[in-house]
Amino acid sequence: MAAFDFAKVKDPTFFKENVLNAHASFRTYASREEYRTGSSSLALKLDGIWKFAYAKNYTSAIPGFEKTDYDCSGWDDIHVPAHIQMEGYDIPQYANVQYPWDGREDVKLGEIPQRFNPVASYVKYFELPESMQGKPIHIEFEGVESGMALWLNGSYVGYTEDSFSAHAFDLTPYLQPGVNKLAVQVFKWTSSSWCEDQDFFRFSGIFRSVWLYAIPTVHLEDVSVKTLFAGDD
């Protein structure tokens, strides 16, 4: 069974694992009536209250929280989507030409801060509605800053960076009947943060919506547009 290795967060040659290919973004409906009402029986939005634990670095983060027998009922509650800095953890930071860790720690090119690099651990329990059961299930994170590792029912699913793109994973092999435990660990800075250094405020966390999608046997996944020119026009 594959396992998450924190060394991946620090490796500038590594930025994703088990992430589904990017594709066009649109909603899928099981019928015309669902389309008319805008309510799909093939989608479950996981936005809302999640359980949450904050740590100032990976060494301080709670080990084994993703396991099914780990009790996180005493953890804090946090809103998803939200930047953790807007929920009372860490503070927002504005940086222009400097890297956000400048002055805190001497970080070599391509590496990441070790002493202060906040880690956000999230847990969400869910049950699939009957309309989604028995179908392949994908999860899509529309925005997570800046890197995240994902587990379902204690099994490692995958890892990704790139804060402002949507990322999807196949949860089908890890699902169980009844209640499922989804665990996410978010890293404020990864080796990719060297490439995301621009003139903006720095935050971290699951800051856009999270969706579960049931995938029908026959479905449209991607679209493309190709323009053909006639003559010299």
Provide a role label for each language-model segment.
Residues 95, 100-105:
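Aromatic- and acidic-residue-enriched carbohydrate-binding clefts of CAZyme catalytic domains
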Residues 61-80:
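Short Gly/aromatic-enriched secondary-structure transition segments
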Residues 41-54, 77:
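Mature N-terminal segment immediately following signal peptide/propeptide cleavage
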Residues 42-43, 68-71, 202-203, 216:
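Extracytoplasmic/secreted proteins and extracellular or luminal domains
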Residues 2-21, 28, 33-37, 51-55, ...:
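Accessory beta-strand-rich segments of carbohydrate-active enzymes
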Residues 227-233:
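Short, solvent-exposed loop/linker segments at the N-terminal edge
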Residues 33, 104-109:
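Short glycine/threonine/proline-enriched tight-turn/helix- or strand-capping micro-motif at secondary-structure
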Residues 37-41, 62:
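A short N-terminal beta->alpha junction/helix N-cap motif
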